[in-house]
Amino acid sequence: MASIAIYSVKGGVGKTTFAVNLAWCAATISRRQTLLWDLDPAGGSGFLLGVDPKKKRAADSIFSASRDPSKLIRKTDHEGLDVLPADESIRTLDRQFESLGKKKRLVRLTAELSKNFDRIIFDCPPVLNEVSAQVMRAADLLIVPLPPSPLSTRALETVVGEVRGSGKGHPPILPVMSMVDMRRTLHRQAREAEPKWPVIPLASAIEQCAVERKPVGAFAPRSPAARAFAQLWTAIERKLAMG
């Protein structure tokens, strides 16, 4: 089993779209039993997978009580892909972790869920607090979507510093340039500055995910966006195999 965190210190970089599409690739391309665990109280991952929230807010009960996390897992319409949706109850999850005094709570929960899943993908909130620290300890690989701008390297340095501060054995980091439009001079310059970073293009098919409530590969499998996510997932599997 491997756990992969999609993390950014700022919003608006396509983090949730990354999480949903990579989870779909894990289940569909690699045929892995995959769980997408939404840790962002906005609950975008469940929405994009067509899973409507339940009226009772209970996502935080996994962390505060001895509740079986599998009881909150929801099936999706995509074979091999389940989601553990978020809700407003985890908005104060950082304080909850601190009050519990359990710095490896997420690690233990992930280990428990790994009995039934080959890949666990975290959709993380854009925060620097105890939630992000718990994710750093639980993840085997960190995917960091970054906008194509001169500030990308600086944003990555912030994440690297946070990861290194999380303790020994921190996960490797894979930066990905997100929402790239090669017609724009600034985007081309950013791409030229970091030629080894994988790229996800700015594409209408990706924006359409919110309308279709499906991963792009499910409704536009031949689109450049679908190919880009498939290539990124292949790179992720390769990196995981290398350890």
Walk through the language-model features, giving the residues of each:
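P-loop NTP-binding core
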Residues: 1-243
